[in-house]
């Protein structure tokens, strides 16, 4: 991928435009996909940090596991807690009381903030600077919109005018943290769309990294939906939330549910982990189990979710599943799963 980065902006644009047709993607999406992949490669090859990172979330489902056909605009990466000094006896779970456990989680958050905004930011800036062209315009900085101060933004060197496909932000969001559980994981490869189309134009078209298993991600998604079902009606639903229902639909539709549902111990581990590290007074993670798991949205959220799903149409490749079809499959799966 590094040879491609050395091409001029105009040369890269020709490749991006030549890739856009078959997948029904705009060239600017192809461009962003390349920079998402390249940023991942650089991040996981940082000498001090790479071995302590794991890739997870929606982008892993599209780029690594090929389960969803939705363009993801961010990178979700977790840092191993033990690397930050919170392993073994210092694990938050090992705290003698709930108060001590929460104190350790806050200390972990502070350590993670310092590492991301300090050494990791500096190292990634140096790595990017050593690879991109000297005449390319780019920046890497902390995301001021993240109240947790654990997100970086890479404003990549674009080959297109800013007024084209304005809905596509010319930045890769790198969402990080250290609260996630890294088990189970596997090593997988990913490839930019432009390299899939023009493999001979890349000396290194793909890259390997550690990624959270797809079954773990299945249960992570399920518990996200479970918590949403129990969200109080007076609390606003997060923006772009319909994507989680769409992703879960695809995980069921593509057969991941079959391998995940025989691993109920993994569901229990996810629920227990979230009850500590993502504590909520209303999420009812204790009920995220066979017989009481809820992945269907509550009735009063359907209208907003339908509208949100419609707004996200441009982020899908090809024809996305209809909202009613998503809801029908989730309803069927929930009913069958909860039969005891």
Segments (PLM) and residue ranges:
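Betabetaalpha-Me/HNH-type nuclease active-site subdomain
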Residues: 62
